[in-house]
UniProtKB/Swiss-Prot annotation:
Oligomeric form and interacting partners: Homodimer.
Gene3D superfamilies: Anticodon-binding domain, Bira Bifunctional Protein, Domain 2
Cell compartments where the protein resides: Cytoplasm
Highest taxon, organism lineage: Bacteria
Function: Catalyzes the attachment of proline to tRNA(Pro) in a two-step reaction: proline is first activated by ATP to form Pro-AMP and then transferred to the acceptor end of tRNA(Pro).
Keyword annotations from UniProtKB, A to Z: Aminoacyl-tRNA synthetase, ATP-binding, Cytoplasm, Ligase, Nucleotide-binding, Protein biosynthesis
Enzyme Commission (EC) number: 6.1.1.15
The species this protein was found in: Rhodopseudomonas palustris (strain BisB18)
HAMAP family: Pro_tRNA_synth_type2
Record-level GO BP terms: prolyl-tRNA aminoacylation
Name this polypeptide is given: Proline--tRNA ligase
Catalytic activity: tRNA(Pro) + L-proline + ATP = L-prolyl-tRNA(Pro) + AMP + diphosphate
Top-level EC class as recorded in UniProt: ligase
Length: 439
């Protein structure tokens, strides 16, 4: 993509309403625009990041055996009355009446609808286990939306729902999602810690929140620092095998949100030099809620003995749009964003330091064409902005690699390759720069 043809509305001044780093940088970098309180338009740069995060989530859900579908944003109020949650959910739910006086709601979550789909088609235990997920926009009418995408009213979420014949099978499904989440966040360059948590309006008696430690987080957390060094399962993890050792390794080290924190256990089990009492950002949460919804909504299957039994369920959420902000909170410096490579809007930026010079123009064009042909997402800054401005823009938007092309370097057959993560620089030939980015 040529920057001269890309829509990138950089802001020179930070909007006053932006209270935290991620909100400030997303607005300044032209990633989004606020349209109403807690509601944002995603501009091209932000959308590229959002789509890459969404794809990682999708790949790891598929790897763990979940099956993608897509449910509508609007749901019938009667479904929620059937489960008993319509009146219990509170003012965060956006309630709508259509022209025929039918009561609808803009879905804040989908347990009722997925249960209705399940009971319409699944009759036997032989069709279990089943895990269905979708990635869809949701709305919760937060009383005080703030912090940009971290606490907005409209947000993109992945929610998965598992169905099993009994509790033992349901806990296996829970474990699959637990491991899938570890892998998902690690691929995004995040250290997300699974912590025991309250179940809230979803219900059930087992839940873990996946928390990224950050002082700007909304959750108070307590953990043993050893949890930061635990290994994340690799590509060879067998989701059909026994995942219990992985789960035990991650849950035997103390980690809990403030809502379920056990002060006595924390004091007793965690050495003083390993105690962490800080704040964190919730990027995902998983629940096992047993037969809470299947009992009320009659989601039954015939068991091995032919007797109908309610299925055991779980739900598993990832805040896809919130992750954009969480990654920025974890990956930035005073100059801007430092995207991990897997979620960056572009992998490399070519900076033409003397636009209009025949030599630099030709070298940049050659690099741009070769990298593009080899499948590298590259942004070519072919604007007439001064070199200092180009450096500032590239740092602000956080492209992992910058190829600086100027007349002095080209005179020696070199370009400068800069790594945004650590600021390291190296003089290499154009061919070496291409090789570095394609191997």
């Amino acid at each position: 993509m040529r920057l001269s043809r890309f829509f990138l509305p950089i802001l020179k001044e930070t909007p006053k309403e932006a209270e935290i780093v991620s909100h400030r940088l997303m607005l300044r970098a032209g990633m989004m625009r606020q349209e109403a309180a807690g509601i944002y338009a995603w501009l091209p740069l932000g959308l590229r990041v959002l789509k890459k995060i969404e794809q990682i989530v999708r790949e790891e859900q598929n790897r763990a055996g979940a099956i993608e579908c897509l449910m509508p944003t609007l749901q019938l109020a009667d479904l929620w009355r059937e489960s008993g949650r319509y009146d219990a959910y509170g003012p965060e739910m956006l309630r709508i009446t259509d022209r025929h006086k039918r009561e609808l709601l803009y879905g804040p979550t989908n347990e009722e609808m997925i249960t209705e789909i399940f009971r319409a088609y699944v009759r036997s235990y032989k069709n279990l286990p089943l895990n269905l997920y979708h990635i869809q926009w949701k709305f919760r009418d937060e009383q005080r939306p703030r912090f940009g995408v971290m606490r907005g009213r409209e947000f993109l979420m992945k929610d998965a729902y598992s169905f099993d014949i009994d509790e033992a099978a349901a806990r296996k499904s829970y474990n699959r999602m637990f491991v899938a989440y570890l892998r998902t966040f690690a691929r995004m360059g995040l250290k997300a810690i699974p912590m025991r948590a309250e179940t809230g309006p979803i219900g059930g008696d087992l839940s873990h929140e996946f928390i990224v430690l950050a002082e700007t987080g909304e959750s108070g957390v307590f953990c043993d620092s050893d949890v930061l060094n635990l290994p994340v399962p690799g590509d060879d993890v067998d989701y059909d095998g026994d995942l219990t050792p992985i789960i035990k390794q991650w849950t035997s080290v103390y980690a809990a949100t403030e809502d379920v924190h056990d002060a006595e256990r924390f004091e007793r089990e965690v050495p003083a030099d390993k105690k962490l009492n800080t704040r964190g950002i919730e990027v995902g949460q998983i629940f096992y809620f047993g037969t809470k919804y299947s009992d009320k909504m009659k989601a039954l299957v015939a068991g091995p003995d032919g007797v109908d039994v309610p299925v055991h369920g779980g739900s598993y959420g990832v805040g896809v749009s919130r992750l954009v902000g969480a990654i920025i909170e974890a990956c930035h410096d005073e100059n801007g964003i430092k995207w991990p490579e897997e979620v960056a809007p572009f992998r490399a930026a070519i900076l033409n330091l003397k636009q209009g010079s025949a030599d630099t123009d030709a070298a940049c064009e050659a690099l741009y064409k070769e990298l593009s042909a080899k499948g590298v997402d590259v942004l070519y800054d072919d604007t007439d902005q001064r070199a200092g401005g180009k450096f500032a823009t590239a740092d602000l938007i956080g492209i992992p690699w910058q190829i600086l092309v100027g007349p002095k370097g080209l005179a020696e057959g070199k370009v400068e390759l800069k790594r945004r993560a650590d600021g390291s620089r190296e003089n290499v030939t154009p061919a070496e720069a291409v090789a570095r980015l394609t191997t």
